[in-house]
Structure formats: structure tokens, C-alpha cells
């Protein structure tokens, strides 16, 4: 029920990469950040999996067309998923527009990059009529290197 079409591809992809049907998914994605001075997380980005320009079918096809031995169980990542709005950018580099526009947090702190002690929380879910399928959350804290 969450299958959908992705963005219009212009220029049109080569024939072997064209999709004639809904080939991606409506998956809500959020990035939250909490510094050591904060008790609650701030939402810093909200995007959607369907913003991927190249859907996973296209990525796998392109990846394997030259003979790459992709097998069951191999991990393949989509890369950064950014939406059309400023608050839907998918990486710190994009969110801060090349480190020139710091993210302002509710604590009064600013970030152009993650710092030691920062905790990042990723969330993903699909929303239906009267129900929600969550992918859980993925959380990590940056620790000092020494």
C-alpha cells in the first residue's frame, strides 16, 4: 500500500533504467539531534524515501550491469535522501548549505557539523489510513576519539 512514483527523471534515463510503474515507496524519514546540553531532541530534517532520484531497482540494475557480483545478504545503501525544501535536506553538509548556514538548536547552540557528545536519532515509518508501520529508531552518540 506504500508503493508510489518517484520524482520525474529529466533527462529520461537510458532504456534499461526506465520504470513504467510505481517503483519506490512513501517512507517518512526524520533526523533528530540532541547535544549534551539538551534534554530533548530537536528535529533537524524531515524527508521521504520517495525523493530518491534513482529508485532501488535502478540502483541495483546499474550496479550489477557491468558484472558486479551482488548477492543475497549484501548491503547496498541508497545514499543521502534530500527533499525539495530546506528542512528536508539529508546531510549536515546540505542542511548547513556547505557549512555556511549553521543549524540553530533550541538550546541556543549552533551546529555546522556534529560534535563530540552529540546524539543523532533516525526514524522511519509508513503511514496508512488509521495505521502506521514503524521501522523503529536508530540512535548513535558521537564519542571523543581519545
Question: Where are the language model's segments positioned?
Answer:
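Catalytic-core "active-site belt" of small-molecule-metabolizing enzymes
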Residues: 1-71, 82-146
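Hydrophobic, well-ordered secondary-structure elements that form the walls
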Residues: 73-76
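Aromatic-rich peripheral "rim/lid" segments of glycoside hydrolase catalytic domains that contact
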Residues: 79
Amino acid at each position: 500500500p506504500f508503493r508510489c512514483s518517484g520524482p520525474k527523471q529529466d533527462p529520461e534515463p537510458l532504456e534499461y533504467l526506465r520504470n513504467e510503474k510505481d517503483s519506490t515507496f512513501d517512507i517518512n524519514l526524520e533526523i533528530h539531534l540532541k547535544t549534551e546540553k539538551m534534554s530533548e531532541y530537536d528535529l533537524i530534517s524531515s524527508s521521504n524515501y520517495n525523493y530518491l532520484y534513482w529508485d532501488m531497482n535502478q540502483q541495483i540494475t546499474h550496479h550489477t550491469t557491468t558484472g558486479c557480483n551482488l548477492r543475497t545478504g549484501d548491503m547496498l545503501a541508497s545514499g543521502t535522501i534530500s527533499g525539495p525544501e530546506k528542512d528536508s535536506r539529508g546531510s549536515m553538509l546540505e542542511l548547513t548549505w556547505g557549512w555556511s548556514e549553521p543549524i540553530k538548536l533550541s538550546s541556543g547552540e549552533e551546529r555546522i557539523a556534529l560534535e563530540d557528545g552529540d546524539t543523532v536519532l533516525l526514524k522511519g515509518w509508513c503511514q496508512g489510513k488509521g495505521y502506521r508501520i514503524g521501522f523503529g529508531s536508530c540512535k548513535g552518540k558521537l564519542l571523543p576519539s581519545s
